[in-house]
Regions:
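Gram-negative/organellar outer-membrane beta-barrel architecture
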Residues: 74-274
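A generic structural motif
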Residues: 190, 279-283
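Intrinsically disordered or highly flexible coil/loop and linker segments, enriched in small
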Residues: 10-15, 217-221, 265, 284
Length: 297
């Protein structure tokens, strides 16, 4: 009860509150509890200090804060801001402290972070009955230029397949709460030896997303790809021969996602629910609707 009262008064701007319970016996089995609250002075945020961000720009952290200089102190917004910063996936530790300015009704808020490694380099090798010997290289940076932008490049090469994927995401496109990104891909598969044909895929995907309310985001996308099956042998299966030529796939995607996970990269608590609807058509060679529901915890 004391903590709840303290939290509620803190949300009203009283950062330094003293709550004292007074217990009075009023019967054999009853007591009366009175809480005496000393609110003190209403506190306002004078300055926000950011520290520990060696690579990351201050703006990346500040835009996740739900309070600004001049606001009344609010403990709920402090906790919410910490969760938002953690949700970027750029930091191992986040600590927000208040530093009372003695003799005034103002306080400084110190936001301290410990950056995590955001660059990744992966190399893989293996064997597949479909593609033969496989090798892959992946490069990814999740904090490009210290602006939380994400860039990744994946290259795959095998005996019968080559693949390249390039992806870029800006979580605050045009300095607005609008994530935007693009994926470009090209896949070439040579199945002449075993199946008597070649298959090429080339295309791109445009992505956007924004927050509707806290934790609920809307996503939209447009995908355009071209499949080409060619160089077919005469003895190839009738099924493959029927697919010879070029096919265009055009997809408009929409999704709603509610995310309560406590960390985007390594979550330890919470859950995520996402509902996707993809509309195939819009000039493509296939027309149908695909829906998908995903739940993770």
């Amino acid at each position: 009860a004391i903590k709840k009262i303290t939290d509620e008064t803190s949300n009203m701007g009283y950062a330094f509150v003293d709550v004292s319970p007074r217990i009075k016996k009023i019967g054999d089995n009853k007591v009366e509890v009175t809480f005496e609250i000393q609110e003190g002075t209403k506190i306002f945020i004078d300055r926000i200090n950011i520290s520990g961000n060696v690579k990351t720009n201050d703006d990346v952290i500040r835009r996740e804060l739900t309070f600004v200089e001049g606001d009344a102190y609010n403990s709920s917004k402090i906790k919410e801001s910490e969760r938002h910063i953690r949700g970027t996936g750029l930091f191992d530790n986040i600590e927000i402290k208040i530093d009372e300015m003695v003799g005034t009704n103002k306080t400084e808020v110190d936001v301290g972070v410990t950056e995590r490694s955001t660059g990744q380099f992966t190399v893989g090798a293996g064997f597949s009955s479909l593609d033969g010997a496989i090798g892959s290289i992946g490069i990814k940076e999740s904090n490009l230029f210290g602006e939380a932008k994400e860039l990744s490049l994946n290259l795959g090469l095998s005996t019968r397949k080559s693949e390249i994927d390039l992806s870029f995401t800006d979580p605050y496109f045009l300095n607005k709460d609008l994530a935007a990104g693009i994926d470009i891909f090209n896949i070439r598969r040579n199945q002449k030896t075993y199946s008597g044909y070649k298959h090429n895929i080339i295309g791109f995907k445009l992505r956007t997303g924004f927050e509707i309310i806290d934790n609920l985001r809307y996503f939209s996308s447009y995908t355009l790809k071209r499949d080409k099956i060619h160089d077919i042998d005469n003895d190839t299966s009738i099924y493959i021969q029927a697919q010879e030529g070029k096919r265009v796939t055009s997809v408009i995607g929409q999704a709603l996602q509610y995310d309560e996970l406590n960390d985007r990269i390594n979550p330890t608590d919470g859950y995520r629910v996402r509902f996707d609807v993809d509309y195939f058509g819009l000039g493509g060679d296939s027309e149908h609707i695909l829906t998908e529901l995903k739940i993770a915890n």
